[in-house]
């Protein structure tokens, strides 16, 4: 059985007996984050089903935006676009950027990604097309805590983010679940 077949089979069993606390939710209200909070965090697999209980959040409480290294790469990158929807359409009033110790992005470089892409058959022309952006993204990430400071600063100074939105920065330990306050938004 392939992975996608396994996922679909699991989903069929799940849907045959869904949790009752999910099926009775109001469709409109369930899209709005109850805590009026958006979280920008990493896509690391160790955070799945671990970060949420460590924060005391559950389904319907917050909007969670994940990417490699919880990076903000531009004034209108996909993370900022998601935050704009969170703020202007869904009522978010606070943002927390959560980095984590032992983040793989600290060891990722544009060179390592370029070599891997070329070895998997991506053309040199395609890599050259994105090389500037790739360098700026992958080579800028040096240390997870510095990246949290950087991401918070980019959100706070973004001309599209209202000044009344509080932006905080936390570090999370993927083995202990411990949170550390890095930046307290005012």
Kindly give the residue locations of the regions a language model identified:
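Divalent-metal-activated hydrolytic enzyme cores
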Residues: 1-35, 70-79, 87-92, 105-186
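Gly/Ser/Thr-rich loops at beta-strand to alpha-helix junctions
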Residues: 44-46, 101-105
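Short Gly/aromatic-enriched secondary-structure transition segments
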Residues: 52-57
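A short, structured active-site edge motif that brings together acidic residues
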Residues: 63-71
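Well-ordered alpha/beta subsegment
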Residues: 93-97
């Amino acid at each position: 059985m392939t992975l996608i077949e396994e996922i679909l089979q699991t989903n069929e069993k799940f849907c045959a007996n869904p949790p009752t606390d999910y099926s009775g939710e109001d469709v409109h209200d369930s899209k709005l984050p109850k805590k009026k909070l958006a979280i920008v965090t990493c896509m690391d697999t160790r955070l799945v089903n671990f970060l949420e209980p460590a924060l005391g959040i559950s389904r319907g409480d917050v909007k969670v935006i994940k990417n490699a290294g919880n990076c903000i790469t531009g004034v209108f990158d996909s993370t900022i676009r998601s935050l704009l929807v969170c703020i202007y359409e869904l009522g978010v009033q606070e943002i927390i950027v959560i980095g984590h110790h032992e983040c793989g992005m600290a060891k990722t470089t544009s060179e390592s990604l370029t070599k891997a892409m070329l070895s998997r058959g991506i053309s040199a022309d395609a890599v050259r097309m994105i090389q500037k952006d790739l360098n700026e993204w992958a080579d800028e990430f040096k240390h997870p805590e510095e990246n949290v400071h950087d991401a918070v600063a980019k959100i706070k100074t973004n001309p599209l983010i209202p000044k009344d939105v509080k932006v905080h920065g936390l570090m999370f330990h993927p083995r202990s679940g411990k949170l550390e306050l890095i930046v307290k938004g005012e």
